[in-house]
Structure formats: C-alpha cells, structure tokens
C-alpha cells in the first residue's frame, strides 16, 4: 500500500494528467497489451484511482502508450510486440517519469 501511495505522489509531482493505451483487438503485436489489460489493469487502477487511464481499441492500430502531462506535453511509448511484463515496465517508467 505504501508503494502505491508513493507512486501516486510521484505521478502527481510529474504533472501526469492522463494515460492512454491504444491497441488492436486482433493483431499479434498487441497481444502483450491485451494480456496486460486482463491481468493488471484493475491493480493499476486501484493504485491510481484519480488518474484517468483510457483504453482505446482500433483495428490495425500499432499499440502505444501515451502519457499526457501538464501544459499539454505528451510522451509516446511503443508497445508493439511487448509481453505483458514489458508493458508493465513501460507503464512503471511513465508513472515514475523515466519514459
């Protein structure tokens, strides 16, 4: 619980406003993202209840993680062909400001 509180504080200090995940419902390149959502989304949302985390599915789209910060700044991380564990690490990097 303390780790979740610490990561919430870190995200707030970085000015993180929103996370968006884009993925394809069927493509093999999005499989790790789909697995991440099934296995870890609920835990992530519980750890960050006030952070909007948007999941967007679209046919043939390349899987990406978008982080929107204060003053309209955005960072993009490709999630193509990553495993669920690698997607988790990418998400942790965004939440800690390393992305």
UniProtKB/Swiss-Prot annotation:
Its main location: mitochondrion. The modification N6-acetyllysine is found at residues 64, 75. GO terms for molecular function: NADH dehydrogenase (ubiquinone) activity. Disulfide bonds join 24-58. It comes from the Eukaryota. It is a peripheral membrane protein. Pfam families: L51_S25_CI-B8. One of its GO terms (biological process) is blastocyst hatching. The modification N-acetylalanine is found at residue 2. Keywords: Acetylation, Disulfide bond, Electron transport, Membrane, Mitochondrion, Mitochondrion inner membrane, Respiratory chain, Transport. GO terms for cellular component: mitochondrial inner membrane; mitochondrion; respiratory chain complex I. Acetylation of Lys-64 and Lys-75 is observed in liver mitochondria from fasted mice but not from fed mice. Accessory subunit of the mitochondrial membrane respiratory chain NADH dehydrogenase (Complex I), that is believed not to be involved in catalysis. Complex I functions in the transfer of electrons from NADH to the respiratory chain. The immediate electron acceptor for the enzyme is believed to be ubiquinone. This is NADH dehydrogenase [ubiquinone] 1 alpha subcomplex subunit 2. The gene is Ndufa2.
């Amino acid at each position: 619980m303390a780790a979740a509180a610490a990561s919430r504080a870190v995200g707030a200090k970085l000015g993180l406003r929103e996370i968006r995940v884009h993925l394809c419902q069927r493509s093999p390149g999005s499989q790790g993202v789909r697995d991440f959502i099934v296995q870890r989304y609920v835990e992530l949302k519980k750890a960050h209840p006030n952070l909007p985390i948007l999941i967007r599915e679209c046919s043939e789209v390349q899987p990406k993680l978008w982080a929107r910060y204060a003053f309209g700044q955005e960072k993009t991380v490709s999630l193509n062909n990553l495993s669920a564990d690698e997607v988790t690490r990418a998400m942790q990097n965004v939440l800690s400001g390393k992305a």
